[in-house]
Curated annotation (Swiss-Prot):
It comes from Tetrahymena thermophila (strain SB210). Belongs to the histone H3 family. This is Histone H3.3. Keywords: Chromosome, DNA-binding, Nucleosome core, Nucleus. One of its GO terms (cellular component) is nucleus. Residues 1-41 are annotated as: Disordered. Macronuclear replacement variant which replaces conventional H3 in a subset of nucleosomes. Nucleosomes wrap and compact DNA into chromatin, limiting DNA accessibility to the cellular machineries which require DNA as a template. Histones thereby play a central role in transcription regulation, DNA repair, DNA replication and chromosomal stability. DNA accessibility is regulated via a complex set of post-translational modifications of histones, also called histone code, and nucleosome remodeling. Functions redundantly to H3.4. The lineage of its organism: Eukaryota, Sar, Alveolata, Ciliophora, Intramacronucleata.
Length: 136
C-alpha cells in the first residue's frame, strides 16, 4: 500500500472512544467457567530453596516413625529372633540415624561443590564416606 501524506485536522475537544482489539473484547466477554485453570508453575529451583529453608527451620523427624520402626525390627530379627524395643529406644535410634544422614549429605554436598557442581552424585557420597574414614 502506498504511503499518503497526512493533513492536520481540527480537534473538537471530545475524544472518540477507541475500538478494542477483537481478541481482547472476546477474552473479556467470554465466560471463564468453561476453561480449566492451569496450576501455577514456579521457576526451577524456587521450590527447592523454599523446602531447604523449611527443613532448616524445623527440628521434626524427617523419616516417618512407623516405617523406621519396621525397618529397625526387621534388622533386629535377622540378628536375634526374640527382641523387644522401648519406644524411646527406637526414637533415639531414629534421631541418631537422621543426624548421621544429614551430616553425610552435608559432606556430600561439599564434595559436589568442590567439584564445581551443584548436583550431588554417588561419587561424592563415596568420597565423603572415605574422607570420614568409613569403608566404601
Amino acid at each position: 500500500m502506498a504511503r499518503t501524506k497526512q493533513t492536520a485536522r481540527k480537534s473538537t475537544g471530545v475524544k472518540a472512544p477507541r475500538k478494542q482489539l477483537a481478541t481482547k473484547a472476546a477474552r473479556k466477554s467470554a465466560p471463564v467457567s468453561g476453561g480449566v485453570k492451569k496450576p501455577h508453575k514456579f521457576r526451577p529451583g524456587t521450590v527447592a530453596l523454599r523446602e531447604i529453608r523449611k527443613y532448616q527451620k524445623t527440628t521434626d523427624l524427617l523419616i516417618r516413625k512407623l516405617p523406621f520402626q519396621r525397618l529397625v525390627r526387621d534388622i533386629a530379627m535377622e540378628m536375634k529372633s526374640d527382641i523387644r524395643f522401648q519406644s524411646q529406644a527406637i526414637l533415639a535410634l531414629q534421631e541418631a540415624a537422621e543426624a548421621y544422614l544429614v551430616g553425610l549429605f552435608e559432606d556430600t554436598n561439599l564434595c559436589a561443590i568442590h567439584a564445581r557442581r551443584v548436583t550431588i552424585m554417588t561419587k561424592d557420597l563415596h568420597l565423603a564416606r572415605r574422607i570420614r574414614g568409613e569403608r566404601f
